Amino acid sequence: MFNFSVSNPINPFSTSSSYLYALYSPLLNKSLNSIFNTFSTNSWDVTHCSTICLMKRVSSSDFPLILYMGFRLYLASIVYLSDSAINILSTCVPIILHLLDLHSLL
């Protein structure tokens, strides 16, 4: 159902963030498009509109949808940060251990 060959702007080498991006991207785009098509009095750029701006424009019945989208983006950022931390640790720790080993030989 989803196209997993989507280019991931977050981190193209990360399996977990690519999977998460492929999952939330279609839903997020569809949700934002439906919200902004409902209020088409002026054409806003979705990428430059903050959550506060969204809350002022949509009705109170759309508030759970906004919270849901924000929660998914929050989870995506946690996955991205943890994935980045793992990548940094997996790169730096062997180098540090190697340098400590070389220092002990001197």
UniProtKB/Swiss-Prot annotation:
This is Uncharacterized 11.9 kDa protein. It comes from Vaccinia virus (strain Copenhagen) (VACV). The lineage of its organism: Viruses, Varidnaviria, Bamfordvirae, Nucleocytoviricota, Pokkesviricetes.
